[in-house]
Amino acid sequence: VEAVATSDLVGLRIKTVRRQRGLSQAQLAHPELSDSYISLIESGKRTPTPSVLELLAQKLDCSLSYLLNGVTAEQMRDLELALGYADLALENGEAFEARVRFVELLADSNLTGLTALRQSAEFGLARAHEACGEQKEAIVIFRRLQGEQLSDEQQIELAKSLCRLYRVSGRLTESVEVAESTLASRSAWSDAYVELGATLLAAYWERGDLLRARQFVAELLDAAEALGSPRALVAANWNAAYTARRTGHGGEALNFAEKALAVQVENGPSRFSGAMHVTVANLYLRLRPEQTSRAIEFLERAMQIFSESPATAFEQANARLERSRAEIMSGRLDTAISFAEEGLTLLPDSAQILATEAHLLKSRAYGLQNHAEEAARELSLARDVLFTMEKADIAVEYWFAAAETSELLGDSDGAVDAYQKALAAAGL
């Protein structure tokens, strides 16, 4: 037990329990302590050492937890159990259930004096908000935690979360600043700092600072190799793959991604390994279309992983949409439509991007089957989603995809309109 900080509350609890037990200060003190020492502790003028607090808890027949925090050992166990269940729900992909549990925990008055436990619950609630697509709410909580005293690991985790949340919210300057300022304070690289650096890379891509991204990824890879830990190697190589892809180095991208996946698989299962298999499959489909069968192998493995370990509906839907793409490329159009429909069924209403992709895949498959009416219907549904999409940079990509699908269906007017929408979304 670390040295206990001087606290009026600790002294008040000792005084309250002593009186409840019908003891005088002298009776509580005898024979190990002086009554004047007890008086100083109760008035908050003296900080009791850990050993003294343990002694007083024994003599008062109460828990050390109560003297320290104002909650009994049983109440502390209940709080820790509630936190564990909330964390487990979040880990299992049950974001809405986790959010409810964290909110209920933070409403418990017994949590008030338990700073570390409260901070853990607030971190959890912020992560749950993010998993529910509620970025603004998550940012508010993390910003509030910025003003508190946190461990080094928590400071890095907070910076990583804010960097990611600012990025997906389009606040790119803040995304870069929060990560760069935290990285600047490091004395040496660690796994956590490499992961923060990997998150910063994504902000560089979004900002269009690809030269800085290429320079920084080299530094990040060197740091990961020097550390030699699986955690650092996966983070650095995985994000190096994205950087290589964004800068037009497709071969490098696939090599980095496969290296990251190999390290991840070698060091045991992870809930992220399924999503990693899907991404590697996507790279094969886009960069090496002649190896579609290889991509399907990765997708089959991903679906197996998702069936054996927790996965979000988003992750499972994404795997099915990539499988639909692979089946279209292989000419198995009925199977492609089936996988796209499965993906759509799994998607939450907020998943605009994947919903657009699903409708475009179905439209393309129907078009290749010469089912013009069904193809046009799916294309129309994709366009409806695109009209509501807030992120212009992503809308550009999908308007171009809609234009290509319109051309496939022989709808030249629709293709021209979609190209114009793409240019407008790009600000041209």
Regions found by a protein language model. Name each.
Residues V1-Q20:
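A short, Lys/Arg-rich alpha-helix, primarily the initiator
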Residues R19-L40:
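Short alpha-helical DNA-recognition segment
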Residues S51-Y66:
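DNA major-groove recognition helix of helix-turn-helix/homeodomain DNA-binding modules
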Residues L81-N92, L117-G133, I156-R171, V194-D209, ...:
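Tandem amphipathic alpha-helical repeat scaffolds
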Residues V103-N110, R143-E148, E180-S187, V217-S229, ...:
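Amphipathic alpha-helical segments of tetratricopeptide repeats
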